[in-house]
């Protein structure tokens, strides 16, 4: 896709320079081709939806990174929601996806990241996800809240594609009779809301996951009205959580004899009339302490506990179950995944179990033996297996199965190998999915094309922008978040990064550097204080001095690669500092709230303040009128840029684009 990038609304700070209005010429438009830099995955893929009849038609959803359609021609996923603007970013969290079983071209995406935000929208496509009609709905969604791996909450009636049901978290059951164009609440559906104390932060993530699963039983319904028998599960515990309608959704009643000691997480209906549900004592992905797998024979009205791991004493299991899937061609073949099992009952990690006799016996897939191919996303080799909140058996190929994780997902094409005692082979299925959270980017002039600081997975060094980092995420140490990464502009091989540690790494420091362009890393010997982490890092043009402003801290200077530190004088706390790309003695920082430009001419030891006549509109984060957050790791207008090859040449971005084009206040600042 070709897009136009215009250099408008960008302000040039001219420290100590004369008026240059006459030197500023109009900037012509430049054509750019935009594409993702592949990391592959990097975020929670919390749901996969296969079309039941059309081979190769499948979609996946993420908690806050949009939705994707599988493209068999390119053998990767295609993003569907990259067109959503910053102002509409709440729609990037996907609550559910539904495909019309009678028409694979009709797909519906329920969007909304947080129930505390504005109402959500349902995006309706009738051309396989190539275009969408946006339908605003009068209820909120929680694509990034607890229970986001449950599902599916939205389903198209398999016998009447005009009818769609949508289960919400806080607003009950809704129905569309016109392919998603309008929605009405099903007032006869029972109240499944939960009460919680808004002041209790521990309860925030579970203030109500609401309706989590919808299943249609098509047996015996062939009158054109749609499906008569519909099952709906709600994330409730200690009260009835599974309901059925036998009159096309007009009335509802709880299914008798159901287990109420857990919350449903997933539900499938087998071809021989068994409703199979996984349960946990939380919706997940929060920790589970109990759960089970149960099946309900809808013809005999009989419940059976078919949990793969059962305790003889009847106590809490210490873990729960996340998801279940059934072979479309053999109703006795199912797989089920656990949550919070690792380190318990002889299992090193969470497990996926397979049964070929309808749940009478199960075999553990990972414990029996497995092989992983990490080549498509090398960083996953050190990422632990977790959050298997959707598992799917391909309806067109029973050997092909997938499971999701917090960094993407895996797939196999020899699922039945476990029955023969052979390894099940897994490879990354996330090609094309890019859900990482970039916190900082650095592009050296030579060597690596890009060095990134990433949320959750540390960071990467890309020597080829078309391939994942073959070295995996940065090591020594592994960071969870890398909030700062930069280098010495006149000494290109020197790179420094700061962040927060991933997991338990005794003795590890939260600052590390590379002297070979990001290939290998060395931990600094010390940090300024015991609490120093994250924040921002600046490196002198020749690498002789580094300045680190840890999170919520004053700035510190080192001239010996972190062996010792001293406080910088003349700066407020938590301010972002950058280095001049020509003069190694010069550093700068901006306080956009107070409109002050700080500069140092002694290698960062001391800073002096000058008034900054900042006329451009500033980014307001939070409530209307709130001041920009100084030191914001994701941007804000305290981020300034130094120009390579030009001493004292600094740039700052205007949040309103070309609106600030007319502003011109010299000699301190020019708007271009």
Regions found by a protein language model. Give the residues of each.
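Signature of short aromatic-glycine-proline-rich micro-motifs recurring in repeat-based ectodomains
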Residues: 44-47, 91-96, 148-153, 200-215, ...
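Short glycine/acidic-enriched loop and turn motifs that connect beta-strands
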Residues: 65-66, 113-117, 171-172, 236-239, ...
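Surface-exposed loop and turn segments in beta-propeller and other repeat-based domains
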Residues: 83-87, 137-145, 188-205, 307-315, ...
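Beta-strand-rich domains and repeat architectures in extracellular enzymes and scaffolds
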Residues: 38-65
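Residue-level detector of Asp-centered blade-edge/turn motifs that repeat once per structural unit
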Residues: 52-54, 101-103, 158-160, 218-226, ...
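Conserved small/polar residues in nucleotide/adenosyl-binding loops
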Residues: 662-668
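Short coil/turn segments at the loop-to-beta-strand junctions that recur within blades
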Residues: 42-43, 84-88, 139-142, 190-193, ...
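A short loop-to-beta-strand structural motif that recurs across blades of beta-propeller domains
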Residues: 66-68, 120-124, 172-175, 241-244, ...
């Amino acid at each position: 896709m070709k897009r136009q990038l215009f250099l408008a609304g960008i302000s040039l700070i001219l420290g100590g320079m004369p008026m240059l209005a006459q030197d500023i010429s109009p900037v012509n438009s430049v054509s750019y081709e935009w594409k993702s830099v592949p990391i592959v995955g990097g975020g929670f893929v919390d749901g996969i939806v296969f079309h039941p009849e059309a081979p190769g038609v499948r979609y996946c959803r993420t908690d806050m990174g949009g939705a994707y359609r599988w493209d068999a021609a390119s053998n990767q996923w295609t993003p569907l929601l990259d067109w959503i603007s910053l102002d509409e970013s709440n729609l990037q969290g996907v609550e559910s996806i539904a495909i019309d079983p009678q028409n694979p071209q009709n797909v519906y995406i329920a969007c909304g990241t947080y129930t505390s935000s504005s109402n959500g929208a349902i995006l309706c496509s009738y051309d396989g996800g190539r275009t969408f009609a946006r339908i605003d709905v009068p209820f909120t969604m929680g694509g990034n809240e607890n229970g986001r791996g449950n599902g599916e909450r939205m389903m198209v009636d398999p016998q009447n594609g005009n009818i769609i049901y949508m289960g919400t978290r806080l607003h009950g059951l809704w129905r569309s009779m016109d392919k998603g164009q309008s929605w009405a609440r099903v007032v006869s559906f029972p109240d499944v809301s939960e009460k919680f104390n808004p002041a209790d932060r521990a309860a925030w993530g579970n203030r109500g996951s609401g309706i989590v699963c919808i299943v249609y039983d098509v047996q015996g319904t062939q009158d054109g009205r749609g499906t008569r028998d519909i099952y709906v599960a709600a994330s409730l515990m200690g009260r009835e959580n599974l309901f059925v309608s036998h009159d096309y959704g007009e009335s509802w009643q709880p299914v008798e004899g159901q287990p109420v000691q857990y919350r449903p997480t997933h539900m499938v209906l087998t071809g021989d009339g068994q409703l199979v549900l996984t349960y946990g004592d939380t919706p997940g992905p929060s920790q589970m302490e109990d759960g089970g797998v149960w099946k309900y024979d809808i013809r005999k009205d009989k419940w059976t506990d078919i949990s793969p791991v059962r305790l003889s004493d009847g106590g809490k299991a210490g873990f729960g179950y996340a998801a279940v899937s059934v072979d479309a061609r053999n109703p006795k073949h199912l797989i089920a995944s656990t949550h919070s099992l690792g380190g318990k009952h002889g299992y090193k990690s969470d497990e996926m179990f397979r049964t070929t006799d309808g749940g009478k016996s199960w075999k553990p897939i990972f414990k029996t033996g497995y092989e992983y191919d990490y080549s498509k996303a090398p960083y996953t080799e050190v990422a632990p297996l977790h959050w298997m909140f959707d598992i799917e058996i391909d309806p067109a190929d029973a050997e092909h199965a997938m499971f999701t994780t917090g960094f993407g997902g895996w797939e196999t094409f020899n699922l039945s190998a476990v029955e023969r005692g052979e390894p099940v082979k897994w490879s990354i299925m996330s090609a094309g999915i890019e859900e990482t959270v970039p916190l900082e980017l650095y592009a050296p002039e030579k060597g690596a094309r890009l060095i990134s600081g990433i949320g959750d997975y540390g960071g990467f060094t890309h020597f080829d922008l078309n391939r994942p980092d073959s070295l995996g995420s940065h090591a020594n140490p592994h960071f969870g978040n890398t909030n700062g990464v930069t280098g010495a502009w006149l000494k290109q091989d020197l790179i420094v990064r700061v962040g927060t540690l991933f997991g338990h790494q005794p003795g590890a420091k939260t600052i590390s550097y590379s002297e070979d362009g990001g290939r290998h890393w060395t931990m600094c010997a010390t940090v300024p204080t015991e609490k120093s982490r994250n924040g921002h890092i600046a490196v002198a043009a020749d690498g002789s001095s580094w300045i680190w402003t840890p999170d919520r801290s004053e700035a510190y200077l080192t001239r010996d690669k972190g062996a010792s530190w001293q406080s910088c004088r003349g700066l407020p706390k938590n301010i972002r500092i950058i280095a001049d790309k020509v003069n190694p003695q010069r550093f700068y920082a901006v306080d956009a709230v107070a409109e002050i430009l700080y500069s140092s001419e002694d290698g960062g030891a001391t800073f002096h303040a000058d008034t900054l006549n900042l006329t451009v509109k500033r980014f307001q984060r939070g409530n209307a009128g709130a001041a920009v957050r100084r030191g914001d790791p994701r941007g804000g207008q305290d981020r300034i840029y130094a120009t390579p090859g030009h001493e004292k040449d600094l740039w700052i971005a205007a949040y309103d684009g070309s609106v600030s084009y007319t502003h011109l206040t010299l000699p301190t600042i020019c708007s271009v």
